[in-house]
Amino acid sequence: MIALIQRVSSASVTVEGKVIGEIDKGLLILLGVEQGDDEQKATRLCERVLGYRIFGDDDGKMNLNVRQAGGNVLVVSQFTLVADTQRGMRPGFSRGAHPSEADRLYQYFVGQCREQGVHTETGQFAADMKVALVNDGPVTFWLQT
């Protein structure tokens, strides 16, 4: 499972012209689910993402996680994160989990974020989404379990 996390001042996701998820300060989490991923990996990745210290403290040092910084999260499924890009001119997606399993684990990950007490907004699995964000930094990290 892969999470591309971006520290944002704001972010939103729109489907069919309607905003379905929106946050101010926090993390935009683009989530890719691979074959072999399970609840244990999703739980571990959620713990890492929510605990990752990428927000500035009073001295400006990256020392606070999203909860400590009073931020929110917007979780958006993105199967292209699991693409095989090693060869050729076209990405391959054979490493991606079957859509039904990917959706289940995406929903599980979202549930884990909410159980941790972080306000969590979402995109819509398998939809054509328009994601808007204002990067803060920019600060972007790739986390993988």
From Swiss-Prot:
Keywords: Cytoplasm, Hydrolase, RNA-binding, tRNA-binding. InterPro entries: Daa-tRNA_deacyls_DTD, DTD-like_sf. Gene3D superfamilies: D-tyrosyl-tRNA(Tyr) deacylase. GO terms for cellular component: cytoplasm. One of its GO terms (biological process) is D-amino acid catabolic process. Its EC number is 3.1.1.96. A Gly-cisPro motif from one monomer fits into the active site of the other monomer to allow specific chiral rejection of L-amino acids. This is D-aminoacyl-tRNA deacylase. The lineage of its organism: Bacteria, Pseudomonadati, Pseudomonadota, Gammaproteobacteria, Enterobacterales. The gene is dtd.
